[in-house]
Amino acid sequence: MSSHIQIFDTTLRDGEQTPGVNFSFDERLKIAKQLEKWGVDIIEAGFPASSSGSFKSVEAIAKTLTTTAVCGLARCVKKDIDAVYESTKAAAKPRIHVFIATSPIHRDSKLMMSKEEVLASIKEHVSYAKQYFDVVQFSPEDATRTELPFLIECVQTAVDAGASVINIPDTVGFSYPKEYGEIFKTLQESVHADHDVIYSAHCHDDLGLAVANSMAAIENGAKRIEGTLNGIGERAGNTALEEVALGLYVRQDHYDNQTQINLEETKQTSDLIARFAGIRVPRNKAIVGQNAFSHESGIHQDGVLKNPETYEIMTPQLVGVKTTELPLGKLSGKHAFAEKLTALGYDVDPEEQKTLFKQFKTVADKKKAVTDRDIHALIQGTEHEQNAIYKVETLQLQFVSNGLQSAVVVIKDIDGNTYQDSSIGTGSIVSVYNAVDRIFDRKTELIEYRIDSVTEGTDAQAEVHVQIKIDDQIVTGVGIDHDILLASCKSYVEAHAKYVANTKVEEGIHS
């Protein structure tokens, strides 16, 4: 019988450390609900002591989820541990993740602590956390660059203090599979406990080895894997959890371990996080990329048509990729639309459904067929506008002279106040963005501008992603519309609105 591998998702904590990614409160709740639906065992919902915004979102997630454990991150600082307790105490399964750096470079350059001081801190704070939590996870940060004898001491100290989960972070993606696996083997042989201890792997992808290292950890006794959807995270990212889940499923003959992941929800979960993060999934990304089940070669196409197993080790349907769908059209009624929402996993109240149906009809008048991706985009766009503190009211453009364009932008805030300004630029989008900058009275730097087509065809909706820098803060925005210029304006206004919201959030503990 296969053993169970726990999946610990840190998309909302480590994943949000991706430059430019800043999930809103509502986005974090939606992601948490979808992760529970996907079947993860534990969600690391945030770092509650870092800000009041993080505390509130962790608290809301803890109150919302019913089956998934909700975990908060804490340094070896009592105020951090208190913040995790207060924010997660309403959870069905509250958890805490306590960490301290243990490698020589971190001890000497960051912590300014001796080995003895680090060990004393581990004992004090794991013991303190154990007073509030049945399950305490401890991580020796930068474990793979920590002297192995000292790493064993740190883990033994944490276990003696009550830790029942030991996580081994490859914090800078430094290790390789054989070495990383040996660390797990050595720790299990060397550390003694009077209670059950689960060993966990947390890998970064700086050398492109995060998933390989995680699988090596499983081969050497790890029973929990930490990571993110789509592998997002700071620098080169984290272990892509969907790759681990499918790797264990497809190669059960080798690993003899399984997760409780609902594989059919994989693509929808990946797409949701990609949209909210504003990070497009690469076409050639394993499992969830657009090319994952595409075959261009004539030989490959011939083989797949005769027998899909010739070139496919898993089916698209396994991960929720639909090869056929019944699109809606302008003649589709309220009942068909409601059934489509349910089929796509949306739980929408009757009043909101009426609003969405009107917007669906507007889209249907412009498109021959409204696909599932159109519906996802419609709902995302509606949610963005409903929750926005500023939204675009009108946009007017006209040609001036000598290649210059002029734009007039009118936006409305959440209280109903309107703001208007105009500007010129060397192109339509430049003039629009200059006008928006004038409204907000901010100097910005446009870092990234990207147009995605929601679906194929000339009648497709445009999804515009922007990343801008304001006062050394990077923020992102998404805008969806049939008109590319209006979608561009919406995305830019949303990015500005995020900056305004972020600057209003009270900063938390920093020490």
UniProtKB/Swiss-Prot annotation:
Pathway(s) per entry: Amino-acid biosynthesis; L-leucine biosynthesis; L-leucine from 3-methyl-2-oxobutanoate: step 1/4
Catalysed reaction, written as an equation: 3-methyl-2-oxobutanoate + acetyl-CoA + H2O = (2S)-2-isopropylmalate + CoA + H(+)
CDD domains: DRE_TIM_IPMS
Pfam families noted in UniProt: HCS_D2 (PF22617), HMGL-like (PF00682), LeuA_dimer (PF08502)
EC number, as in UniProt: 2.3.3.13
Top EC class for this record: transferase
The keyword Mitochondrion is assigned to this record: no
Cofactor(s) required, per the database record: Mn(2+)
Keywords assigned by UniProt, alphabetized: Amino-acid biosynthesis, Branched-chain amino acid biosynthesis, Cytoplasm, Leucine biosynthesis, Manganese, Metal-binding, Transferase
Binding site for Mn(2+): 14, 202, 204, 238
Subcellular localization, as worded in the UniProt entry: Cytoplasm
Source species, domain of life: Bacteria
PROSITE patterns per record: PYR_CT (PS50991)
Annotated GO CC locations: cytoplasm
SMART domains per the UniProt record, alphabetical: LeuA_dimer
GO molecular function, one term: manganese ion binding
UniProt-listed SUPFAM superfamilies: 2-isopropylmalate synthase LeuA, allosteric (dimerisation) domain, Aldolase
Domain (Pyruvate carboxyltransferase) ranges: 5-267
Gene Ontology annotations of biological process type: L-leucine biosynthetic process
Function field: Catalyzes the condensation of the acetyl group of acetyl-CoA with 3-methyl-2-oxobutanoate (2-ketoisovalerate) to form 3-carboxy-3-hydroxy-4-methylpentanoate (2-isopropylmalate).
HAMAP family: LeuA_type1
Sequence similarity: Belongs to the alpha-IPM synthase/homocitrate synthase family. LeuA type 1 subfamily.
Quaternary organization: Homodimer.
Protein name as catalogued: 2-isopropylmalate synthase
Protein source organism: Staphylococcus saprophyticus subsp. saprophyticus (strain ATCC 15305 / DSM 20229 / NCIMB 8711 / NCTC 7292 / S-41)
Gene: leuA
